[in-house]
């Protein structure tokens, strides 16, 4: 499957927003209407926050800036958006894990709950190869192969 060069961050932000919204939904005390407002506002806030810190050609660049973190203190972006739907800080702390790390990077969104939890991938897409040789001719030929190449010896008899 080939991908065109993609510079937008829509799938990654949608994955992050969907995950955070589902965490709020599981407790059942936030109405669907308020969750929709939260989702839209969070999508807008993250898009604005990340716009000068999104580097598809170097996905790890800016990763710390894009990281959403709850470590007994609420991430400021989540706090701001939650206040728009009337959720207070204490309510947020009841609804969300006390320790959550959410990495929103080009081509991958992953999270960890707790300091020692496993990292789980929410969204993953293979990065686009550039014309600068991320895929060499040899690698391109090997891509379709499921088994290692066989070695052949050619002999010439006289």
From Swiss-Prot:
The entry's keywords: Phosphoprotein, Transcription, Transcription regulation
Q: Which residues form the signal peptide?
A: none
Task: Write down the PROSITE patterns for this protein, in alphabetical order.
Answer: BTG_1, BTG_2
Signals that turn on the gene: By nerve growth factor. At lower levels by epidermal growth factor and membrane depolarization. At much lower levels by fibroblast growth factor and interleukin 6.
Q: Which SMART domains match?
A: btg1
GO cellular component assignments: cytoplasm; nucleus
Which residue positions does Phosphoserine occur at?
A: 147, 149
Q: Which residues are connected by disulfide bridges in this protein?
A: none
Q: Which InterPro entries match?
A: Anti_prolifrtn, BTG, BTG-like_sf
Molecular functions per Gene Ontology: transcription corepressor activity
Q: Does the keyword Phosphoprotein apply?
A: yes
GO annotation (BP), single: negative regulation of cell population proliferation
State the superkingdom: Eukaryota
**In what tissue types does this protein appear?**
In brain at embryonic day 13.5, placenta, amnion, and spleen, which are proliferating and/or differentiating.
Q: Which Pfam families match?
A: BTG
Q: How is it modified after translation?
A: Phosphorylated at Ser-147 by MAPK1/ERK2 and MAPK3/ERK1, and at Ser-149 by MAPK14, leading to PIN1-binding and mitochondrial depolarization.
Q: What does this protein do?
A: Anti-proliferative protein; the function is mediated by association with deadenylase subunits of the CCR4-NOT complex. Activates mRNA deadenylation in a CNOT6 and CNOT7-dependent manner. In vitro can inhibit deadenylase activity of CNOT7 and CNOT8. Involved in cell cycle regulation. Could be involved in the growth arrest and differentiation of the neuronal precursors. Modulates transcription regulation mediated by ESR1. Involved in mitochondrial depolarization and neurite outgrowth.
Q: How does it assemble?
A: Interacts with PRKCABP. Interacts with CNOT7 and CNOT8; indicative for an association with the CCR4-NOT complex. Interacts with PIN1, inducing mitochondrial depolarization.
Which protein family is it in?
A: Belongs to the BTG family.
This protein's name: Protein BTG2
Organism for this UniProt entry: Rattus norvegicus
